Amino acid sequence: DRLRSRGLGDVYKRQVPALIDVQTGKVVNNDYNRLTNYFEVNFREFHGENAPDLYPEELREEIDKLNIWLFHNVNNGVYKTAFARSKEAFWDAYNAFYAALDILEERLGHQRFLFGDYVTDSDVRLYVTLARLDIRYAFQLGHTKQRLIDYKNLWGYARDLYQIPAFKNNTYFKDFANPSNKKAGHLMETFNARFLDEINFDAYWGAPADRAHLSSDPGNKFKIGKR
C-alpha cells in the first residue's frame, strides 16, 4: 500500500542521484533535475568558507533554461540514440546532439564558461557528458560525427574544468571507459578494456587549456558565495 510507505524508497525503484538521510537510511529526495540547486541554495549555511556560488541569484532563470536545454539535447541526447527503436528516432537524436555541440562550441568561443567568467551549475552538468563522450558514449553514437578533441573550444573548456581539483578528483575515466556489462572471458574486447591501464588520461586532460584570456578575472574560476 503506497499510502503506508515509510519513504520514497518504498515506492520508487532505486535510482541515482538520490539524497539519503544517513540516520534513517531513507531516500528523502531523488529529483535529479533540481537536486544540485537544493544544495546550492537550501544548504548554503553548511557550505565551507569561500565556497563557490554555482547558482548566483541574478543568473538563476537563465541557468534553469539552459539546464533544461542541456538535459534534452546533450545529457540525455546520448541516451536517446542508445535507446532508439527506429532509424528515424536514432538519427533525430543523433543530429540534435551534434547540433547542440555545435551551438556550445560557438558559445564557448568568446567566453571561458557557459555564463562568462565563472563556473556555474550548468558547467557541472555539461562536464559530466563531455568527460564520457570520447571514451564511452562514442560506442553508443555509432558513426561519430566529431570527437570531443575535434572541437577546439569544447575540448579546451573541458580540460579547463578538469584541472579544477574538485572536478579532477571526481572524474573516473577508467570506470567510464570500461563498460559495466562487459562479459568475462569475451574474446572481442574493446581497445579500452584491453589497454586501459596503459592509457594516461591525465596527460591528455591535464594539458594547458589556454582559455584564461577569455575571462576578465583570469585568476579565478569561481565566484565566491555569501553564507
Where are these regions (language model features)?
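GST-like fold's C-terminal all-alpha helical module
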Residues: 23, 27-172
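Single conserved hydrophobic/aromatic residue that forms the stacking wall/gate
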Residues: 1-12
